[in-house]
Curated annotation (Swiss-Prot):
The keyword Phosphoprotein does not apply. Residues 115-132 have a biased composition (Basic and acidic residues). The gene is proQ. One of its GO terms (molecular function) is RNA strand-exchange activity. It comes from Proteus mirabilis (strain HI4320). RNA chaperone with significant RNA binding, RNA strand exchange and RNA duplexing activities. May regulate ProP activity through an RNA-based, post-transcriptional mechanism. Gene3D superfamilies: ProQ/FinO domain (1.10.1710.10). This is RNA chaperone ProQ. PANTHER family: RNA CHAPERONE PROQ (PTHR38106:SF1). It is found in: Cytoplasm. One of its GO terms (biological process) is post-transcriptional regulation of gene expression.
């Protein structure tokens, strides 16, 4: 006997059983309920099949009996069959109710999975459309045109960052120039011209060539008579 290729999946085993026992295992269409204890019958008939283990056979039977087309066949009036397709008794009400429950749960799972897939697809399409759509630009506010008869208001001029310097306060007092230094005394207060400004000063020393005065900031300087005023 030639070595047969090893069966790797439950679907391959089901196809093998449908070919080996066509009156028991239905490859297409509504399946017939199997005889109670069909697993032991299969083990006995397939004991010489080296490409098939008991574990693989049990998994294949579990897949076959949980399929929708098998659960549809478990109904009132249906009869169980053996490996040769012979009737082996009617189904019990408990088995029929169990099959209906399994079928309803299987349908609910499929519907939930499909709904989840549709939701993910819509979400993915929405993200794709959002990424393609350019960001909307904010419209620039349009200036309202003046109505007939109204004058356009001039734009306010921007103020300079630096405040304008205050003009030096002019000394409005009427001063008398010093013509004779002999009238001056040490410690006397008077006015002195410093550049374009008139500042307070105190007499420190009187000499022939001029008068030495001290300003409020502590600076001492020699000043000619024509720059002094009362």
């Amino acid at each position: 006997m030639e070595n047969q290729p090893k069966l790797n999946s439950s679907k391959e085993i089901i196809a093998f059983l449908a070919e080996r026992f066509p009156k028991c295992f239905i490859a297409e269409g509504e399946a017939r309920p199997l005889k109670v204890g069909i697993f032991q019958d299969l083990v006995e008939h397939l004991k010489d099949e080296t490409q098939l283990s008991k574990t693989q056979l049990r998994s294949a039977l579990r897949l076959y009996t949980s399929s929708w087309r098998y659960l549809y066949g478990v109904k009132e009036g249906a009869k169980r069959v053996d490996l040769n397709g012979n009737d082996c008794g009617e189904l019990e009400a408990e088995h029929i109710a169990h099959a209906r429950t399994q079928l309803a749960e299987a349908k609910a799972r499929v519907q939930a999975q499909r709904a989840e897939q549709r939701a993910k697809k819509r979400e993915a399409e929405g993200d794709k459309e959002t990424s393609k759509r350019p960001a909307a630009k904010k419209p620039n506010p349009r200036r309202q045109a003046p109505k007939d008869g109204e004058k356009r208001q001039p734009r306010p001029q921007k103020q300079a960052n630096q405040a304008p310097r205050k003009a030096p306060r002019q000394n409005t007092e009427k001063l008398t120039p010093v013509k004779d230094i002999s009238v001056l005394t040490v410690g006397q207060s008077l006015k002195v011209n410093v550049g374009s400004s008139v500042m307070d000063a105190t007499v420190l020393e009187i000499a022939k060539e001029g008068v030495r005065v001290q300003l409020p900031n502590g600076l001492a300087m020699n000043v000619r008579t024509e720059h002094l005023k009362f």
